[in-house]
Amino acid sequence: INWTGNTVYPSQLLMQRLKIDEGDPFDISLLNERINAAEDAVGNLYLDNGYLFFNANPVITQIEDDSVNIEVRINEGKQARLNRVIIEGNTKTNEHVVRRELRTQPGDLFNRSAIQRSQRELAQLGHFDPEQMGIEPININQSRGEVDLNYSLVEKPNDQLEISGGWGAG
């Protein structure tokens, strides 16, 4: 496996992250998963460092007997910074309560892990339905390297009524 277009990370580090060694059976779906989809995928290395526009394309360059040569062509793109962090759906919960749990602030580099951590911490508050929580990059401007991040929240009903009484004979 050869890497082209990578300037941020050396090929050796990308190979370690890929976890596919020379001599392993060729499996294109596993290769694509290890580049883009797995939790510790090569692409996540870039997404955690602001490279929202990262793209990797594996291409078979040579097939000989029982061997396949692959070239992974990388387009790193430019780093993206968060322009605005938008919070929607918090009708009862004060916005500063939500913002203090966020690991994503305007001006920060786009960071996939920080977004996931923010989502976990918002869910742990107990005020929002984690199943309906949505976090989406919007207003993506590749030429300026900017993106807005939209947190769409649905508050859980937490109204409680407690009644107690007593009876005594006197």
Annotated model-derived regions:
Residues 1-169:
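Periplasmic polypeptide-binding modules associated with outer-membrane biogenesis and secretion
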